[in-house]
C-alpha cells in the first residue's frame, strides 16, 4: 500500500506511526549498496528498506515497489507499504549462501522471471555510464575511462535478443534458498531489458560457470547456446564499465575504501578484455 508524505520520517517516527507493536531485530548488510533492518511482532517479520543511493530520484525507489507489487511471491518478497524513503516487504526465511546455486537451478529462476509481464520501464546503460563519469571524483577520471565511454557511446547498446523484466543484481548475497525454492531480494535495479544483459551481469566465479549458466538457460529458452553466449559477450564491456563507474560513484559518495579496490580491479578486467 503506497502512502504519500512530503516530510521524511525518522526510523522511530516511521515505526511508531505504522508499526507501533513491532520492534527492530537486526540489521542486514548483505550487499554493497547498503543495509535494511528487520522488525518483528509475535513471530511476524517484515524487512524495512530505505533508498541505497541518497542522490537517486524518489521515482527509482517507487519503481522498486511497483516491480515487487507485480512479481509473484514465489520469486520475490511481497511489498506491504511504500512511503517516501521507506518500504516494507515480507521477510523471506531461508539461507543466504556465499556461493551461487547450481547453474541449472539458477537458470530456471531467471527464465521464470523473464517470462513474467514487463515492468514498463527500460534499462538503458549509457545514461548511467555518463552519470557515474560526471559524479565521480575528478581526480579519478582518466583519459582511458573517457575513451572507453566515447567508444561505447559511438557503438550504441547491442540489439535486443529478447526483451524481458530483469533483476540486474544477481549474486549469491541476493539469493535466498528457501524451503519452496530460490528467491531474489534487492530489486532496486530492476527494469526491462535484454535477457543476455541479465545473464552477463550475474556475479559468477569463473568463465566455466558462466558458460554453463548460459548453456542451461539456452536449453530452457530454446536458443542456440553459442548464439546466446555471443550476445552475452557483447554486453561484457558495458557491464564492466557500469560496475567500474558505480564503484567510483559510490567511492565519492561514501569514502569507503572497498569501492576504490573494487573499481581498480574492474578497470584491470576491462584492460585485459580489450
Curated annotation (Swiss-Prot):
* Cysteine disulfide links: none
Q: Name one GO molecular function term.
A: thiamine kinase activity
UniProt keyword annotation of Metal-binding present: no
UniProt keyword Magnesium present:
no
Which pathway, per its entry?
A: Cofactor biosynthesis; thiamine diphosphate biosynthesis; thiamine phosphate from thiamine: step 1/1
What GO terms describe the biological role, i.e. biological process, of this protein?
thiamine diphosphate biosynthetic process; thiamine metabolic process
> What catalytic activity is recorded?
thiamine + ATP = thiamine phosphate + ADP + H(+)
Q: Give the residues annotated as coiled coil.
A: none
Q: What is its EC number?
A: 2.7.1.89
Arranged from A to Z, the UniProt key words for this protein are: ATP-binding, Kinase, Nucleotide-binding, Transferase
Q: What the protein does?
A: Catalyzes the ATP-dependent phosphorylation of thiamine to thiamine phosphate. Is involved in thiamine salvage.
Q: What is this protein called?
A: Thiamine kinase
Amino acid at each position: 500500500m503506497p502512502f504519500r508524505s512530503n516530510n521524511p520520517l525518522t526510523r522511530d517516527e516511521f515505526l511508531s506511526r505504522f508499526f507501533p507493536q513491532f520492534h527492530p531485530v537486526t540489521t542486514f548488510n548483505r550487499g554493497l549498496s547498503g543495509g535494511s533492518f528487520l522488525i518483528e511482532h509475535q513471530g511476524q517479520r517484515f524487512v524495512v528498506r530505505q533508498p541505497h543511493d541518497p542522490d537517486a530520484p524518489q521515482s527509482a525507489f517507487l519503481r522498486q515497489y511497483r516491480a515487487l507489487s507485480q512479481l509473484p511471491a514465489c520469486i520475490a518478497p511481497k511489498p506491504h507499504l511504500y512511503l517516501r524513503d521507506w518500504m516494507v516487504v515480507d521477510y523471506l526465511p531461508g539461507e543466504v549462501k556465499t556461493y551461487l546455486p547450481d547453474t541449472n537451478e539458477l537458470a530456471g529462476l531467471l527464465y521464470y522471471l523473464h517470462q513474467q509481464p514487463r515492468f514498463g520501464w527500460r534499462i538503458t546503460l549509457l545514461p548511467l555510464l555518463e552519470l557515474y563519469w560526471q559524479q565521480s571524483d575528478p581526480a579519478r577520471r582518466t583519459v582511458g575511462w573517457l575513451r572507453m565511454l566515447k567508444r561505447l557511446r559511438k557503438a550504441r547498446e547491442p540489439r535486443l535478443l529478447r526483451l524481458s523484466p530483469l533483476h540486474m543484481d544477481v549474486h549469491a548475497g541476493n539469493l535466498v534458498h528457501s524451503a519452496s525454492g530460490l528467491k531474489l531480494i534487492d530489486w532496486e535495479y530492476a527494469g526491462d531489458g535484454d535477457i543476455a544483459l541479465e545473464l552477463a551481469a550475474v556475479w559468477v566465479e569463473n568463465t566455466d560457470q558462466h558458460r554453463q549458466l548460459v548453456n542451461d538457460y539456452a536449453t530452457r529458452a530454446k536458443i542456440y547456446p553459442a548464439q546466446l553466449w555471443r550476445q552475452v559477450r557483447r554486453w561484457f564491456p558495458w557491464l564492466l564499465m557500469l560496475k567500474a563507474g558505480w564503484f567510483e560513484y559510490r567511492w565519492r559518495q561514501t569514502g569507503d575504501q572497498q569501492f576504490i579496490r573494487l573499481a581498480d580491479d574492474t578497470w584491470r578486467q576491462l584492460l585485459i578484455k580489450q
